[in-house]
């Protein structure tokens, strides 16, 4: 896999766990796409964790030794609390109650951040996309299910689950 890593000093990995597909990306510090992997989302919490670790391993194995991997971000199609536990994910088989952040963080050597996929999409829009210079926005995600996030004064509004 040629990831176009010339002049890259830092990178991050993002993994989107959707109801039907799981997408892994590696981004440069400027937000440029360096690599992308896509797999069907497996049924079951153990299989989901194994897939996330496999994607992380493959993507992180592609970077040069002088490139600093800063973090792993995971977006989940469902309700996720502030500890990174999946509270309710109707389109992910047997994922409710999965402490995904805790399980993944114990296996990787970078900080792990887990959030609802719509919140992750909103963060991307605030930092790099259409909402970059806009204080307030509504982000709607469409996939196997439908989701949304509200941006107020440049910050993702957090509901009852954080």
Please report, for each region that a protein language model flagged, where it lies by residue.
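Short glycine-aspartate micro-motif
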Residues: 10-16, 69-73, 113, 137-141, ...
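Glycine-rich phosphate-binding loop and adjoining helix at the ATP-binding site
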Residues: 41-42, 46-53, 57, 67-72, ...
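A cytosolic small-molecule/anion-sensing beta-strand core signal
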Residues: 29, 76, 82, 152-153
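Short glycine-rich, Thr/Ser-proximal phosphate-binding strand/loop in the N-terminal lobe
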Residues: 2-50, 54, 67, 85-87, ...
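Glycine-rich phosphate-binding loop of actin/hexokinase-like ATP-binding domains
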Residues: 132-162
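Short glycine-rich anion-binding loops that position phosphate/pyrophosphate groups of nucleotides
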Residues: 20, 77-79, 143-145
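Glycine-rich phosphate-binding loop plus the immediately following alpha-helix
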Residues: 22, 114-118, 159
